[in-house]
Regions:
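Long, C-terminal-biased catalytic regions of enzyme "large/alpha" subunits
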Residues: 1-90
Length: 90
């Protein structure tokens, strides 16, 4: 099972629902338009990209989320997501 390395170096099992939940929160706080299909699609794409890895860092996942939001023309959501990420890293 894919392991995620958190900021405190703890390892946890990969859970794509955490990714989609974070995206949905960013959508609500960014554009105010919540699009569950886009959030689920991004989470699934990241899961597929990481499938062959044994571990991935939370910062790598966050970068992938941000890039995919931009690619899917979700700029306001990406900005809200990036703001949340900056606070967490601080």
């Amino acid at each position: 099972m894919l392991q995620v390395i958190k900021r405190n170096c703890e390892q946890v099992n990969f859970d794509k629902s955490k990714i989609s939940d974070a995206i949905l929160k960013a959508m609500k706080n960014g554009s105010g338009i919540v699009k569950p299909k886009i959030a689920e699609s991004i989470a699934s794409e990241i899961e597929d990209e990481c499938r062959d890895k044994q571990e991935v860092s939370i910062s790598d996942i966050e970068s992938m989320v941000y890039d995919k939001l931009i690619t899917k023309k979700q700029r306001l959501t990406a900005k809200a997501y990036e703001g949340y990420r900056s606070i967490r890293e601080f």
